[in-house]
Amino acid sequence: MLRISVRLAFLTALVVAPPAFAAMANDPQITRGKYLVTLGGCNDCHTPGYFFGNPDMSRFLGGSDVGFEIPGKGVFVGRNITPDKETGIGSWTPEQIVKAIQTGERPDGRILAPIMPWHAYAELAADDAMAIAAFLQSLNPVSNQLPRPVKPGEKISTFMFRLVPPGETSAVAAK
């Protein structure tokens, strides 16, 4: 009876906590990925509350609560990059995550928002890019439905920062 209980407990742990189990399976890669995500400042745009000085670490990388306006392009919100299958990148493979980080292309062929600095990550070593993907997949999924990107001139429903290219400050200030 005790043997059956131990087996059931073990099987339940495997089913209930797959991200934690995955993290244990390749800890050095996950650790490296966490380091690179921290160094790359991913939380800046992808963690709620970060820009207000009060990051909500229970929703770490679960998507921002701030939009970024790029004049002439619209307003974009940092997406949920946790493994939530509905609102995050939980259905993406590690290779698809790496492609998005390094080329700015999503699995469905759409291009990431212009604010995503994929150009800065285009030359990451393959091992480093895969470490980032492994770390992101090891996180607890965060369900967080975010506003869609907003076209120029459309009404927005979130706080936003306006990014102003050099030389355009006086035109934007006049608005």
Feature map (PLM): residue ranges:
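An amphipathic alpha-helix signature
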Residues: 94-98, 102, 126, 130-133
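Second-shell loop/turn segments in exported
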Residues: 83-89, 118-120
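Bacterial N-terminal signal peptides
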Residues: 5-19
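Alpha-helical hairpin
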Residues: 89-92, 124
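The canonical Cys-X-X-Cys-His
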Residues: 33, 39-49, 97, 132, ...
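Flexible coil segments in periplasmic/lumen-exposed cytochrome c-class electron-transfer proteins
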Residues: 27-28, 47-76, 107-175
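Electrostatic cytochrome c docking/interface patches
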Residues: 21-38, 51-54
